[in-house]
Curated annotation (Swiss-Prot):
Summary of the function given for this chain in its UniProt record: Involved in iron-sulfur (Fe-S) cluster assembly. May act as a regulator of Fe-S biogenesis.
Sequence similarity: Belongs to the frataxin family.
Gene: cyaY
PROSITE patterns: FRATAXIN_1, FRATAXIN_2
GO biological process: iron-sulfur cluster assembly
GO molecular function annotation: ferric iron binding; ferrous iron binding
Organism: Pectobacterium atrosepticum (strain SCRI 1043 / ATCC BAA-672)
CDD domains tied to this protein: Frataxin (cd00503)
Iron keyword on record: yes
Name of this chain's protein: Iron-sulfur cluster assembly protein CyaY
PANTHER family: FRATAXIN, FRATAXIN, MITOCHONDRIAL
Length: 106
């Protein structure tokens, strides 16, 4: 994957996340902000989740209340380098924990 392809895929991922949050109908108030390729999700309890792209490594990084994760694209999925877990599944789980209700990004 070259840098241009990485940027396109990362942009598509951020757009998908933003659209999902815009359509979220739960009780939790989850605010999202994108600035310089970094997406910050802010929750009512003051906690945050940060998603950013690491261009030199062609990775997506996720920082949650419980830890940091690095994801590489494998077979059209962003997969955690450490656990092999899918980005969307891990993000959904982290958002659900921090929002206090179920949040799905799929």
């Amino acid at each position: 994957m070259n840098d241009s392809e990485f940027h396109q895929l990362a942009d598509e991922l951020m757009l998908q996340l933003e659209e999902t949050l815009d359509q979220f109908e739960g009780d939790a108030d989850i605010d999202s902000e994108i600035n310089g390729g970094v997406m910050t999700l802010s929750f009512e309890n003051g906690s945050k989740i940060v998603i950013n792209r690491q261009e030199p490594l062609h990775q997506i990084w996720l920082a949650t209340k419980t830890g940091g994760y690095h994801f590489t694209l494998r077979e059209e999925r962003w997969v955690c380098d450490r656990s092999g877990e899918d980005f969307i599944a891990l993000l959904s789980s982290a958002c659900s924990a921090q929002a206090g209700e179920t949040v799905h990004f799929e």
